[in-house]
């Protein structure tokens, strides 16, 4: 157990050697040298990614949770930015971060910690710096670099997606995290066909766990339901993840030199397809395997409950099921797959053509099979997104006409129109 000890002094501490002792043997004595211009303080938060020289704002925050003590308000304290040679290159006083009462999730101030802001946007020279607060200390070193800060962030996010892959072993050749293959039929995992659709679950018509648990235990086994990316903190793989595939496609299509050159150290690295697209294909291929011969898309795989305590993805004891097909899931897949095929075409035309044909089949099935239940307009809202993506990828005027006839450019949220 880690305990944070907050000590309040009547006056700011000078730079000095400090020894902390406790009245009993429960806490061992701690000795350290305190210098507010170099000593680390967890109260000073800087960007782990760093900044570009021309970033409009470069900020750090100062905040610490006092436990059961009184809130610690540091507004007005002096701050400095110090380079590697110890030179002060910027300074100022802490400003309050929030200018109005804090109301988090409608529940007031959940942290009980005041937050102050440091804006050091005037620092533009590349290098490594410390952001320090008088009588408090300094945050972790922050770097200003021309090319590495945002690129590093993009690589970390995409690498995190690789670690969310289902149906693949993680080994030392691609990761410091090693785990067995998870949720793969060759390892004895049995996944059966459910009657409930992911759209019905998404619309809260029924709870997913309860509906799946009611599935016939002898229902049809779906042989090829492996792959995709795990969802959040559990092992679901839902068609929503095609949004990620579509966003990855946008990155590579719009910025081929930058996003297309990112090397993620994944199994596909070096195969001629940008790594960002290769990882997106891991999800697209999963849903293509779930596609029925008539084009319908089944909306993913889910188990009958949240992960069991002390279990892991490769030893998941819960029963797993494939959702039944529905038009909303088919539109979502059609939009993402068409966008991905469009981005993939310059690198692997054959695979792109197969993916685009799959996307068209999904869109055509959704057009011919409107919802048989009240879906609160979800399929209708997704329809123009799929049509726009299919038109962009194929040039087929029928999809253009469908966009024109169905898109609500006045009331529909921009993200719903792609």
PLM regions: where:
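Contiguous beta-strand segments within globular domains
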Residues: 41-73
